UniProtKB/Swiss-Prot annotation:
Purpose of the protein: Catalyzes the insertion of Co(2+) into sirohydrochlorin as part of the anaerobic pathway to cobalamin biosynthesis. Involved in the biosynthesis of the unique nickel-containing tetrapyrrole coenzyme F430, the prosthetic group of methyl-coenzyme M reductase (MCR), which plays a key role in methanogenesis and anaerobic methane oxidation (Potential). Catalyzes the insertion of Ni(2+) into sirohydrochlorin to yield Ni-sirohydrochlorin (Potential).
Record carries keyword Cell cycle: no
Pathway annotation: Cofactor biosynthesis; adenosylcobalamin biosynthesis; cob(II)yrinate a,c-diamide from sirohydrochlorin (anaerobic route): step 1/10
Annotated Ni(2+) binding sites: H18, H83
Top EC class for this record: lyase
Name this protein carries in UniProt: Sirohydrochlorin cobaltochelatase
PANTHER family to which the protein is assigned, alphabetical: SIROHYDROCHLORIN FERROCHELATASE, CHLOROPLASTIC
EC number of the protein: 4.99.1.3, 4.99.1.11
Transmembrane segments annotated in the record for this chain: none
Length: 143
């Protein structure tokens, strides 16, 4: 029996941000990635949908170059919207050609990536008690 048959695929994590001409969002997403990396046992990359670098395809290529076989993509957005439901899946090649109703182009959407492994796309952050705790802390510090 092959000893590799029971091995799990090498996993990478891609945190996706919107991107901006201003540096603040990029700094926050990179800061979140740095915190996550401290306890992660797999490679972590950051990619941006628009206006910032690295783009989502560039980040996928970065993870692929590390030999990952499965990429878990997490949008660092609070809620679903056009970007999480249409634009990001389209960039990831997960939309099966669905057009949606969003008709402006994004700077990175025509870039390609070289990855033939599995891509798993997660939900955005959502209504999570940990986010409510952050809000409580902000309110408490402002009182």
């Amino acid at each position: 029996m092959d000893s590799n048959s029971n091995q799990k695929p090498k996993i990478g994590v891609l945190l996706v941000g919107h991107g901006s001409r201003l540096p603040y969002g990029e700094e926050v997403i990179n800061g979140i990635a740095d915190i996550y990396r401290q306890e992660a046992d797999h490679p972590v990359a950051v990619g941006f949908m628009n206006m910032s670098r690295p783009s989502i395809p560039e980040a996928i290529n970065e993870l692929a170059a590390m030999g990952v076989e499965k990429i878990i993509v997490t949008p660092v957005f609070l809620a679903h919207g056009v970007h999480t439901k249409h634009d990001i899946p389209h960039i990831l090649g997960l939309d099966n050609g669905a057009e949606g109703h969003h008709h402006h182009e994004h700077e990175h959407e025509h870039e390609e990536f070289e990855f033939d492994g599995e891509i798993v796309y997660t939900e955005p952050l959502g209504a999570d008690p940990r986010i409510a705790e952050i809000i409580r802390d902000r309110v408490k510090s402002a009182i």
